[in-house]
UniProtKB/Swiss-Prot annotation:
Hcy-binding domain: residues covered: 13-330
Protein name per Swiss-Prot or TrEMBL: Selenocysteine Se-methyltransferase
InterPro entries for the chain: HCY_dom, HCY_dom_sf, Hcy_S-methyltransferase
Regulation: Inhibited by L-methionine.
Reaction equation(s) it catalyzes: S-methyl-L-methionine + L-selenocysteine = Se-methyl-L-selenocysteine + L-methionine + H(+)
SUPFAM superfamilies attached to this UniProt entry: Homocysteine S-methyltransferase
Cofactor(s) needed: Zn(2+)
Induction (record text): Up-regulated by selenate, but not by selenite. Down-regulated by sulfate.
Expression across tissues: Expressed in roots, young leaves and florets, but not detected in plants not exposed to selenium.
Length: 346
């Protein structure tokens, strides 16, 4: 059992965490939209990483909101935080690296604050001492470009495997050494970038494991048009990858994708979809009323778990309310899991 700031080495295998949490674990929800709700201005290529500079206390608040809603895994505000991105803003390499470290430290501090709060009782919050993992979020090269290419996966012929490895190497290293338990390689838009991440892990750039999560806009392939099965096969072959799945994708596509993924992986499957709202890249805003409400989002949860999902949460436009609703749904599922696993021991 992990307490306080103890590193979660016991969960080098994601399977151990899942055993502790009754077969299903909850990932947090959207960070950027919550930060905006708390008053942050994210109109910037750095997006939520801007708050590392301007309002770290808001990031801490949002992490804590998710833990109190029942999340078992919280992700750092580093999705769009890159050394190159900070340098473009005029920051030194040292300052850029310290901001990456800070993103993980804030999440670790929120976990400690949460553990302290677990001594109190509050009916409205889930205050339960449990293993909580801090995931260091790594967005794609396209997320750094902030030109929408993370949603197309088309980087052009000039971007090679080596370009991508060089781009991510130091960032992954710094995040891995900052106290995180796992690296979340998120919204991976193509096979080439998955290969780059896998090779960095194989080369020992990070001492901690990672998860690979892809995005899809058609429910069949990843956004670049690469086959989801081929992308998952890259993750499957990498020993340091401890879970695979889908994020930043409309809920209606998830079940079909998971059924495909389950055919080619033995690793735990994770999903954290968007609310389903459409993003308008021209206007840089979400189109209201194009998504599903919390009830509808949660109504999908059973189907996803039946299809083989073990870790679930939300991505863009999902909130602590979404996560609390998932937690409620999982409580009954977890009790079934524990009764069936105890009966299977006789």
């Amino acid at each position: 059992m992990v307490t306080g700031n103890t590193k979660a080495e016991t969960f080098y295998s994601m399977k151990e965490l899942l055993k502790e949490t009754g077969g299903y674990a909850i990932i947090d929800g959207g960070l950027a939209t919550e930060l905006e709700r708390h008053g942050a201005d994210l109109n910037d290529p750095l997006w939520s990483a801007k708050c590392l500079l301007t309002s770290p206390h808001l990031i801490h608040t949002v992490h804590l909101d998710y833990l109190e809603a029942g999340a078992d895994i919280i992700s750092s505000a580093s999705y769009q935080a890159t050394i190159q991105g900070f340098e473009a803003k005029g920051y030194s390499i040292e300052k850029s690296e310290s901001l990456l470290r800070k993103s993980v430290e804030i999440a670790c501090e929120a976990r400690s604050t949460y553990y302290d709060k677990c001594k109190d009782d509050d009916d409205k919050k889930i205050l339960k001492k449990r293993p909580i993992l801090v995931a260091a979020s790594v967005g794609s090269y396209g997320a750094f470009l902030a030109d929408g290419s993370e949603y197309s996966g088309i980087y052009g012929d000039l971007i090679t495997l080596e370009t991508l490895k060089d781009f991510h190497r130091r960032r992954v290293q710094v995040l891995a050494e900052s106290g995180a338990d796992i690296i979340a390689f998120e919204t991976i838009p193509n096979k080439l970038e998955a290969q780059a991440f896998a090779e960095l892990l194989d080369e020992g750039v990070a001492k901690i494991p990672g998860w690979f999560s892809f995005n899809s806009k058609d429910g069949v392939n990843v956004v670049s048009g690469d086959s989801i099965k081929e992308c998952i096969a890259i993750a499957e072959a990498c020993e340091k990858v401890v879970a695979v799945g889908i994020n930043c994708t409309p809920p209606r596509f998830i079940e079909g994708l998971v059924l495909e993924i389950a055919k080619v992986t033995s690793k735990p499957i994770l999903v954290y979809p968007n609310s389903g709202e459409r993003y308008d890249p021209e206007r840089k805003e979400w189109v209201e009323n194009t998504g599903v409400g919390n009830e509808d989002f949660v109504s999908y949860v059973e189907k996803w778990m039946d299809a083989g999902v073990s870790l679930l949460g939300g991505c863009c436009r999902t909130t602590p309310t979404t996560i609390r609703a998932i937690h409620k749904r999982l409580v009954s599922r977890r009790s079934l899991f524990s009764s069936s696993s105890s009966s299977s021991h006789h």
